[in-house]
Amino acid sequence: MRTHLYLFLASLIVLCAQIENGVADEAATKKLVEQVVTTAGGEEKLLKLFRFRERVLITDTPAAPVAVDTKENRTSVVQVSGNWWVGNNKRDKDKVRVLCWAWSLRILLDPKSKITEIAETTIADKPAFGLRVSEAIKEPIDLWFDNESKRLIAIDYTDTRHLFSEWKKTTAGHEYPSHVAGYRFANRADGTLNKKQWYQTDILELTPLAELPAELRPSK
């Protein structure tokens, strides 16, 4: 009987320690989320609905940004975590909508998101810490932040690492990276990438919107 009591008490102590560690981990993760959102200007400065003009290139050779319209340019309207229109055509690719949701950081504030801290790594020669988001989406997505600046530096999603740079700010104070380069993983498990990019996007203009343009609103 005494042995059973000792085993019960030992199990209880282990369980309490696990709960305490879990609470501590959750608090540390919450603090990191607060830091990166604060760095971005707070929740009110996270993009939610916007129009942007971009150049998208499927190329393994990095190209310099352009300021003029070319045939590769397109204009889109995005509802973060919602719909995405290219021109007046709704885009049905779920993965790009999830990627944009993460890029906006609003995915970190969704109550359905389970967020866990992941081991630090080096990205673009900079130490980076990571936050993994799951449950709110079908496949987990990893957001990486510069250790020093606390800015978003990369997103790992499915088979690609998307690297962000060339930060800009809207007239209303929303900050965003205007250059994105995508590298497919050679080995996702150990984080190694192919040597050459497979696409790049350059945002030429971005405007936050207060409401959907009339031509995109559902007909009554």
Regions found by a protein language model. Give the residues of each.
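N-terminal, post-signal-peptide region of Sec/Tat-exported proteins
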Residues: 45-83
